[in-house]
Amino acid sequence: MVNETRTQAEPIAVIGVGSIFPGRGGNTGYWRDIFQGRDTLTETPASHWLLDDYYDANPLTPDRTYGRRGGFISPVPFDPLAFGIPPNALQQTDSAQLLALIAAKHALDDIESTSGVEIDRTRTSVMLGVASATELTAHMAGRLQRPVWVNALRQSGLGEADVQAIVKRMEDHYIEWKESTFPGLLGNVVAGRIANRLDLGGSNFVTDAACASSLSALQIALHELRAGDSDTVLAGGVDALNDILMYMCFSKTPALSPTGDCRPFSMDADGTMLGEGVGILALRRLSDAERDGNRIHA
C-alpha cells in the first residue's frame, strides 16, 4: 500500500532556478564550476575574519580555529530601491535576507524569461532551509557586552573618562540598534521578506534541520503542492553564516577537516567544510507546468 501511494504521488517539476554560490556565482557559473571540477574553497577573506586574529593549527588552543578555508560568496551588488527597501535599513538587515531576495527574484525571472508565462503570485509560497542563528544576531549580541568592557577597564585602574572614551570606540565597531534591527536579524524573515517584497500571497516560513535544512524545505514544498495548498513554491536553502562563530563551533566539536578539504565517501575523509550559498528552486505540479507551457528544468 505504501509503495502504491508513492507511485501515485503527483510529479513535481522544477520550472525556475535562482542561485548565488562561491566561485562563479549564479546558475550558469555554478554549473560550469561543477562541470570543470573546479575547487571553489579558498582561504578565509579579510572581509569575513582575519586569520591572524583567530587561526591556530593546534585544535586545543583556546578561542582559536584550526580551519582557514571555506566556501565564500563574492560581494554581490544590491539595489535596495529596486526591492523597496530603505537604504538606511541595510546595515540592520542580515546579508542572508538580501541574498535570498536576489536569488528568489532570479528564480521568478527564470520562469518568465524561459516560458513567457507569469505565475499566480497569490498562490505562490516560500519555504526555505535557514539556520536559526544569523550573523547579525551575533553582531548585535556583541554590542551588548558594554558592561563587561566597562568593568574590565575600571578594574584595570583607568579613570572614568578614559573608560568611557575607550568603550565608545569599541561600540563604534558595532552598528546601532534601530527599529529595523529586530526583523533584520530574524532567520524566519529570510522567507518573509521574499514574500513581502515580491508580492507572494502563499505561505512563507523557514525550517531548521541543521545540515538537512534544504532537503527538509523541499520535502515540505512537495507536500504543499501535492495537497493543493499552493500552485508554486520557492524552496531551497540559504546560508551566509561563515563567520568566526561558526568556525569556532565546528572547530571545538571538532568537526572541521584539519587538512582543509571535504572528501565525502572517501577513506581519506577527515571532517566537513563550511560554505556559504543560496539555492532556490521554483516548483510546480508537473501537470500544471505542462498545461501552462512552463519550461521544465527537471
Outline where the language-model segments fall.
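Condensing-enzyme catalytic core of the thiolase-fold
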Residues: 2-298
